[in-house]
UniProtKB/Swiss-Prot annotation:
Homodimer. Component of the SWR1 chromatin-remodeling complex composed of at least ARP6/ESD1/SUF3, PIE1, SWC6, SWC2 and H2AZs (HTA8, HTA9, HTA11). Interacts directly with ARP6, PIE1 and SWC2. Interacts with FLX and SUF4, two component of the transcription activator complex FRI-C, and with ASHH2 and TAF14. InterPro entries: Vps71/ZNHIT1, Znf_HIT. Pfam families: zf-HIT. Expressed in root, lateral root primordia, shoot apex, leaves, stems, inflorescences, flowers, axillary buds, developing siliques and premature seeds. Zn(2+) 2 binds at C145, C148, H161, C166. This is SWR1 complex subunit 6. Component of the SWR1 complex which mediates the ATP-dependent exchange of histone H2A for the H2A variant H2A.F/Z leading to transcriptional regulation of selected genes (e.g. FLC) by chromatin remodeling. Coodinates SWR1-C, FRI-C (FLC transcription activator complex), histone methyltransferase and general transcription factors. Represses flowering by positively regulating FLC and MAF4. Binds to the promoter region of FLC chromatin. It comes from Arabidopsis thaliana (Mouse-ear cress). It is found in: Nucleus speckle; Nucleus. One of its GO terms (cellular component) is nucleus. The gene is SWC6. GO terms for molecular function: identical protein binding; zinc ion binding.
């Protein structure tokens, strides 16, 4: 890997960015909007969790001591049996987002002494400086992108960031 990087030719030509583009990239509003958009995309990706029905396997739920278990599993006349299609539709139901779960929890109805997600206390601010992490690998980052402001830790992560993650065209 090191040999590939040393054999690579490096350009001395500087990049010219349009003044409007540079102004848009340096504004904190655009950077916060891009960060919020990335967080929403992550939340949407995490929302597609597959639900597994534990009561799906009837044979696994039978007692091993009961030899006549398969005879006692007859359907009652009043109950409806779920079809495969109904089970598949139930499994495909869209999972709820975090905000929807918070609204359903009805946290306002709880007594005031009960700690909730919204009432959780934050400790005093740290006396040490803030730590920044690499947007590619998660290690401690010492550098940041001059175009979009995201952080990276090494040349390898910088190259990956430039190829795939740089938000220079968001504005």
């Amino acid at each position: 890997m090191e040999e590939e990087m040393s054999n690579r030719r490096v350009s001395n030509r500087t990049r010219k960015v349009a003044t409007k583009m540079a102004a848009a990239l340096t504004s904190n509003d655009n950077r916060t909007q891009a960060a919020i958009a990335r967080l929403e995309a992550l939340e949407n990706d995490n929302g597609a969790i597959e639900v597994i029905d534990l009561n799906d396997d009837e044979e696994a739920s039978l007692d091993e001591d009961d030899d006549l278990g398969y005879l006692q599993k007859k359907q009652h006349k009043g109950s409806k049996r779920k079809t495969r299609q109904a089970k598949a539709l139930e499994a495909r139901k869209a999972p709820k987002s975090f905000l929807e779960l918070l609204q359903e929890a009805n946290l306002e109805s709880l007594p005031s002494h009960v700690p909730t997600y919204l009432k959780a206390a934050v400790g005093p601010p740290s006396s040490s400086s803030r730590r920044y992490f690499c947007s590619v690998c998660g290690y401690i980052a010492g550098y940041n992108c001059c175009l979009c402001g995201m952080r990276f830790c090494s040349i390898r992560c910088q190259n990956i960031h430039k190829d795939t993650r740089c938000q220079k065209f968001v504005a």
